[in-house]
Amino acid sequence: LKNHAKNVKLFLDKDMTAQIGGLIVAKRPVFIAEPGIGVAYKTIMVDFPWFGGFARVQKEKCVKSLHDAYRGEHRGQKVLEISNYSSESLGVALSAFNLAIRNGKGKNFTVECIFQSSKIFADGGPYKDLLYCSSKEAKKDIRLKTSGQLKSFALNNQLFPLEPKTFFYNWVYINTLVKNERLALEILDYDAFTDIAFNPN
């Protein structure tokens, strides 16, 4: 794969995939933990063979392909896919669709529902009823696409700006994770993390 990439200029589509001969190649980020002062991680983009299709098994093949490509250059590192397509139960539990925090009334809210229900648009929001939907329903709610430009986020009577990018999402995720002590400890066993569905484009 690396030799092909040296000789062929890749023209990536919106899904960050390209074709080299008969091989479909994708590019996805790998987030590498770097504990210490300042930014605690770095991001690298990795090229890997892509398996097209909507079936779950195809996504799982893509995850394995991405991890194999990464470990080929970073031997000995433990990589965890954080999504419902993870082969490890920890990765599934850490997905934003599943990782949840419990309020004082005993109700669980997932990271995804908190994030989507906090969006303020030019023409509406925040839609707090999304807290009580499934994560999938919250993400696909039509109002998130028909309420104009995203302006900010609101949570617990506090406003959050759009910049720095991903700040609010990261803040929600980290604050939810620390409330799940077992998961927060288990994640420390890994060196790098992926989300096969995440496309930075």
Model region roles, listed by residue range:
Residues 2-84:
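Short, extreme N-terminal leader segments that mark the start of a protein/domain
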Residues 73-74, 146-151, 182-188:
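Short amphipathic alpha-helical segments, especially helix-boundary/capping motifs
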Residues 79, 86-93:
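Compact, well-ordered interaction domains used in eukaryotic information-processing assemblies
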Residues 85, 158, 193-196:
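Residues at structural and domain junctions
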Residues 123, 142-144, 188-196:
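Charged, low-complexity intrinsically disordered segments
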Residues 198-200:
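Active-site nucleophilic cysteine motif
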